[in-house]
Curated annotation (Swiss-Prot):
Family named by the database record: Belongs to the BCL7 family.
Species name: Caenorhabditis elegans
Reported tissue expression: Ubiquitous.
Name listed for the protein in its UniProt record: BCL7-like protein
Region of interest (Disordered), residue spans: 59-146
Compositional bias segments (type: Basic and acidic residues): 135-146
Disruption phenotype: Animals are sterile producing no oocytes, display a protruding vulva phenotype past the young adult stage of development, and have disrupted or no alae formation. Fewer seam cells in larval stages post the L1 larval stage of development and impaired seam cell differentiation with large and irregularly shaped nuclei in seam cell-derived hyp7 cells. Defective gonadal growth and proliferation whereby gonads are thin and shortened probably due to decreased mitosis, and abnormal germ cell nuclei which are irregularly shaped and enlargened.
Annotated Gene Ontology cellular component terms: nucleus
This protein's encoding gene: bcl-7
Subcellular location: Nucleus
Predominant location: nucleus
């Protein structure tokens, strides 16, 4: 009798797991995905990520804000993309290319932490063969001996 109860419990667990899998799979089939520019927490890094379309975006029509005159000082150009409300998704400033390297700077300032220089480097390195350290080894040996 004890073993019958165990098999009965296992059967109900498996059945509930199967039902849960069916529900999840049916939701995944109808879920819509879109690629959005997402700001990573605690950084200024923005990456494209596939995110599910929220029900609010599907149901609510996009809010169109009144187009104002663009000042010369303004960095943002009013458009349908910039007027949509988004909590975790941000649009990049228009002066930056989306595919640019994050270490690239368009400013005329010099990064003091950078080890790069603007002067040409006259490196005359040759990869003609293996490096010979025998002269350095001989000099070391003679300096160690009194």
């Amino acid at each position: 009798m004890y073993s019958a109860n165990r098999s009965h419990r296992a059967e109900t667990r498996n059945r509930s797991k199967d039902e849960l899998r069916k529900v999840i799979n049916s939701l995944e089939k109808v879920r819509r995905w879109e690629k959005k520019l997402v700001l990573i927490k605690d950084t200024n890094i923005r990456i494209y990520k596939w995110v599910p379309v929220s029900a609010q975006n599907i149901m609510a029509p996009p809010k169109i804000k009144e187009v104002k005159e663009v000042d010369e000082e303004s960095n943002q150009v009013p458009s349908a993309e910039n007027s949509q409300d988004s909590t975790s998704v941000t649009q990049p400033p228009p002066q930056f290319d989306i595919n640019e390297d994050s270490n690239f700077s368009t400013g005329d300032h010099f990064d003091s932490d950078s080890n790069q220089t603007f002067e040409p480097q006259n490196y005359q390195g040759g990869a003609t063969g293996s490096t010979d350290f025998s002269s350095m080894r001989d000099a070391e040996m003679t300096s160690k001996q009194p």
